[in-house]
């Protein structure tokens, strides 16, 4: 059972600005996650092992954030995977008629496998530390298929209390001096995402053209669609923080079960 949902960023300002709004938002997400009683996390990242034409599900029992240009060595995440839950996720995705593949690293025996994970998983899990199943979206699949994937992943949890985290940064073209240059579409995209979260209206994302996210240079749409499917109804949303301190937008939001 999904007991908690979150949109969490994966940008390094969360470490560089420990008193900033994003870091404070992440600490608040951690408090709410603890209060939810979630024993494990299913986390969707846009930067993991991306499979042509398929959703990806990490089956490994151990997770280790690989060295990367965004995260200092002292912040690299080490934690546990959730092989049993991963198998259930794959089973429900298959039965939903969705293309999905399981992944291990180094060995097919999940108990002996340590999967190198990306900053998109490692940064949120540093704050929201739980045994986790890492999943990756697939941009050639439709919005509706991403929602159905979220629904299938929720079914996989059974009666176990599990949280779903959409790791997402938004428009990456807020400044002219960023690595991707300026995009006039980044701010409107981010403004509309904030509005959707405030109104608890993730379902509206289903009608968004993915080209809009691409024009805004955002990596967030697909994970939020999966989150929408996983949550269904019966959750209240709260936007905890938003900022674009560099070239990309970062947002923290919680989705808690209604009493």
Predicted regions and their residues:
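Short, catalytically relevant binding-site loops at active-site mouths
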Residues: 141-142, 170-173
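Non-transmembrane, aqueous-exposed alpha-helical and coiled segments at domain scale
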Residues: 51, 151-156, 162
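Catalytic metal-binding/acid-base residues of hydrolase active sites
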Residues: 47-49, 170-171
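Flexible, D/E/H-enriched segments
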Residues: 1-39, 50-147, 178-259
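Beta-strand elements within well-structured catalytic alpha/beta cores of enzymes
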Residues: 39-45, 160-168
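Alpha-helix C-terminal capping segments
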Residues: 125-128, 153-157
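Short helix-terminating capping/connector loops at secondary-structure junctions
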Residues: 1, 159-160
